[in-house]
Amino acid sequence: MKDTIKTFSTPHGELSIDTVADAKMAKVFERGEYHQQDTVELLSAFVNNESVFVDGGAHIGTITIPLARKAGHTIAYEADAATCDILRQNIERNAVSVDVRQKGIGERSGRGEIASVREGNAGAHTLLVGEGAVDIVTLDEELERFDVMKLDVEGMELSVMRGTERIMKEARPTVLFEVNLSQLRAHEAPLHALDAFFRGRGYSLYLPFRSSGQLVLGAASSLSLVALCMYPGAYFLNRTSSVFDIIAVPEGKAVPLPVVPVWRTMQYVLARNLQEKIGRVRKYLI
């Protein structure tokens, strides 16, 4: 094992991580916190022992492993070879059953290569389609169906969904995806196109957040409006943006968490933007 790999005891098991390649997440573990705990709670509400869960961009398994304990069948995609090795070790260490596939996922089958987006954050690697050592597949080719998917593929979300047309039509899965304005631009995938993809197939979009300590789903009438109000600098000036998650739920499907209206969602978004600005000013003054 590399000297830079360290194992942490977490609420969801023993997890190893490369403390150099994944310095950002390692610091979260060092503080005794769990990376994406809210995401685990959110997805767990949609999964049961009959569900097929897909983790697209599984990284070291922070979502894969706790969800595998609840889902009937779990499939994890991780394109980066070194990260996938750690993922497999973490799965074995925690004695959960996961079908691990060292492949990239996209709109069509082919080849590609891994490119680093941010140093010290291996989870932020992206996939460049073309020539390379990475096998790229579509989910329609790979799978018969799935019920719930988490998608964190650094700007390739729209491409992956276009390769999932049949499953979207036949199985009507719930999809949690990350919105990263910077990476969407890098992959020439407009946010409004991602929004239209889901709404055009009969999906409602929600922004997950905490209200009075409770996890809720905020109705999102427009992803562009949410992004504009949350990160105006990234939206208008192409600055590097932070990310936020959106969950797409088929219309008519029961939602297992409280839903709040659009005005409450926007109230939260504007307050979050203001809090981040105040935080930056305080950091500068101190």
Located regions from the model:
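S-adenosyl-L-methionine
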Residues: 1-90, 96-99, 125, 129, ...
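Conserved Rossmann-like nucleotide-cofactor binding loop
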Residues: 82, 106, 156
